[in-house]
Amino acid sequence: DEVTDMSFMFNGCKKIKNLDLFHFNTEKVTNMKNIFADMISLNDLKITKFGTSNVQDMSYMFYNNENIENLELFSFETKNVKDMSYMFSGCKKIKKLELDNFFTNDNLEKINSMFSSCYNLEKISMTNINTKNIKDMSHLFENCYSLSSLEITTTEFITTNVIDMNNMFLNCESLPEIKINFDTKLVQDMSGMFQGCKALQNINLDGFDTSLVHNLKNMFYGCESLLSLDLNKFKTNNVSDMSFMFYECKKLEKIENINNLDTSKVENMEGMFQGC
């Protein structure tokens, strides 16, 4: 009952298929980093009574659980969690994540790569999300090939303090739209942000202040359904790399306010509009 650290507890137990922790008392645990990571055979995990109210670190918690298809996390309290980076990364068979009880605190700082390489994930629900202290959203949904529904309360998905958005939606090739009111005034890296988003037709860039951004490489690379873009808010006076920025945007008919692209510091424009 006095245990506070369960990090790496079952990490790398590659042959365990079923794990029932119904009677575990975890009320005082503060660290669950990597607790179930790399359990590549696990397909049945019972943690519905897990007490997580004091946990501060959930990073890599289910990392590379490539055979698990369902996670019931309704009992999870995340009010004190600071780190959720790579939490579900590599959960290749999960199709749906209901996380409406997640992200409800002001303490959360890291969510980079949280859902990366969840190949079959179709839907994520995060309607109570609070991201106002997040600085790193890089690789957040990277390689979520099947993701077609992203339920987010846009007023709470705050990006005011985010510095890094590189590869945030990389290869989300089934996502038809992204409804997020982006505030990017502190972001420095947007490289590969929407790369490979094959189904995206429109992206609202109204909140895109890019005055601090230095890297726009591959930003819209392979957005082959994109019809138009308005760069009205783009300020690119600090950008050094615009290579392959609009590469293979095959249906792109119109880029409004393209004159806003200040290229005075750009060193690389290779393939910028190639294949348009």
Residue ranges: model-predicted function:
Residues D1-C276:
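Negatively charged
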